[in-house]
Amino acid sequence: MKALSKLKAEKGIWLVDAPKPVMGHNDLLIKIKKTAICGTDMHIYNWDEWSQKTIPVPMVVGHEYVGEVVDIGQEVRGFNIGDRVSGEGHITCGHCRNCRAGRTHLCRNTSGVGVNREGSFAEYLVIPAFNAFKIPDDISDDLASIFDPFGNAVHTALSFDLVGEDVLITGAGPIGIMAAAVCRHVGARHVVITDVNEYRLELARKMGATRAVNVSKESLKDVMKELGMTEGFDVGLEMSGVPSAFHAMLDTMNHGGKIAMLGIPGGEMAIDWSKVIFKGLVIKGIYGREMFETWYKMASLIQSGLDISPIITHHFKIDDFQQGFDAMGSGQSGKVILSWD
């Protein structure tokens, strides 16, 4: 089968002929229709420090996808051949304390599809049936292929009550932009998103952000005055991993504010903890998606009218994968989709 593999311990990714994956008794075999390129895939493509420590070579990568079930393990119940599915990319152990308590997204033994095991940049993928999610008929393949990052946005955004609240999002990558759309859809008052990338900020405006702020040109505090905000933001969603962005968030949070952190700093990050203490801030770390409550919420949000389609800006056939990675690497894109049909 065709697959995109990290063949060498250097920058790049290669289109190869790989063996079809072998299915177990509790697995599904999925014929891939569309995949999306994630920021994690770009780290692997660029072979950065994290990738060098994490990714075995060779490895078929990718974890954002939609496909069709073409074979079912003999112990699997609840799925049929022909079902359209996406899937949770975190394969959990099922026996640690968190898994047994139903908190599977906090499994300490998580294995990542396309990171620790063969991924979805291929004509076929095998995953445990437990990890598969049936896609409702009224949700398109394009949207289903980005459910993984959309889930990051939904998990982060819905960590705290948003109705009538003022929300600051630092980092206008695709996940931050989708989070802005979620916040507006569920009833936040002002949703302000910050970045220095004008292309991404314009996408955020299209997706419903009240104000998309280029912090290299505008002061966040001036924007707050413009919006009539006198006390600070009630909810912060940190999506960038950039220390200066998080510091700006701490400066502008209201007393009693709540912060959800998805962005991963490049290293240790010093902060002024006195601001956290004296403001009585709550900080929550976010990893992945809640299984499977986040997935049901994703589908319900789209079915209730949330439109995240503007975040998809580029489509390529799999043979043109290099153009897709170039588009993602340019910073002048939203989500990039590769078609395997």
Swiss-Prot record:
Keywords: Cytoplasm, Metal-binding, NAD, Oxidoreductase, Zinc. It comes from Shewanella sp. (strain W3-18-1). This is L-threonine 3-dehydrogenase. Belongs to the zinc-containing alcohol dehydrogenase family. Gene3D superfamilies: Medium-chain alcohol dehydrogenases, catalytic domain (3.90.180.10), NAD(P)-binding Rossmann-like Domain (3.40.50.720). Catalyzes the NAD(+)-dependent oxidation of L-threonine to 2-amino-3-ketobutyrate. Zn(2+) 2 binds at C93, C96, C99, C107. GO terms for molecular function: L-threonine 3-dehydrogenase activity; zinc ion binding. The gene is tdh. Its EC number is 1.1.1.103. Pfam families: ADH_N (PF08240), ADH_zinc_N (PF00107). One of its GO terms (cellular component) is cytoplasm. Its cofactor is Zn(2+).
